[in-house]
């Protein structure tokens, strides 16, 4: 029997290809930035456009690798300043050194996990 290809599988294939191309362009942008920053920005712009056109969500690690305002690849120490902040809500603060935009990524979940593990260790010592 002949297997009929559904239209859905074609869309999934296109989305997978689009994601691979976007990943490759973002990887290239990081390596090319040192020689030609404008080309790196163009690569990021193309990667974003490909992902949006194919309606593909970029994974979190890729989304956080470029500035959404100026399309510069965020390379810690070169194009970005990274700081840990311990305010009310602990977060990582990433500042784009090209345009000055500040990103804040909370890491409260990790703090709560560490605190819970610490409390379990204290209970074990008290019981033992």
UniProtKB/Swiss-Prot annotation:
Gene Ontology MF: a single term: zinc ion binding
Cofactor remark from the record: Binds 1 zinc ion per subunit.
Gene behind this protein: rnp4
Function: Part of ribonuclease P, a protein complex that generates mature tRNA molecules by cleaving their 5'-ends.
Compartment list: Cytoplasm
Keyword tRNA processing assigned: yes
Family per similarity comment: Belongs to the eukaryotic/archaeal RNase P protein component 4 family.
Quaternary data: Consists of a catalytic RNA component and at least 4-5 protein subunits.
GO cellular component: cytoplasm; ribonuclease P complex
Catalytic activity: Endonucleolytic cleavage of RNA, removing 5'-extranucleotides from tRNA precursor
List of residues binding Zn(2+): 67, 70, 96, 99
A single GO BP: tRNA 5'-leader removal
Entry's EC annotation: 3.1.26.5
Chief location: cytoplasm
Cofactors that this protein relies on: Zn(2+)
Name this polypeptide is given: Ribonuclease P protein component 4
